Amino acid sequence: MKRTYQPKKRHRQRVHGFRKRMSTSNGRNVLARRRRKGRKVLSA
């Protein structure tokens, strides 16, 4: 059985990246929440 996680840099950025997060209001909520929590890394 093949493993489910087959990493691709482009896919990771496009789905979970900073610009993707900034492009929607909910994504901006995610970033704000992570800033409030004090995360060192905000997005992929």
Swiss-Prot record:
Transmembrane segments: none annotated. Residues 1-44 are annotated as: Disordered. Keywords: Ribonucleoprotein, Ribosomal protein. GO terms for cellular component: ribonucleoprotein complex; ribosome. The keyword Ribonucleoprotein applies. Gene3D superfamilies: 1.10.287.3980. InterPro entries: Ribosomal_bL34, Ribosomal_bL34_CS. GO terms for molecular function: structural constituent of ribosome. The keyword Mitochondrion does not apply. It comes from the Bacteria. Residues 1-22, 31-44 have a biased composition (Basic residues). GO terms for biological process: translation. Belongs to the bacterial ribosomal protein bL34 family. NCBIfam families: rpmH_bact. This is Large ribosomal subunit protein bL34.
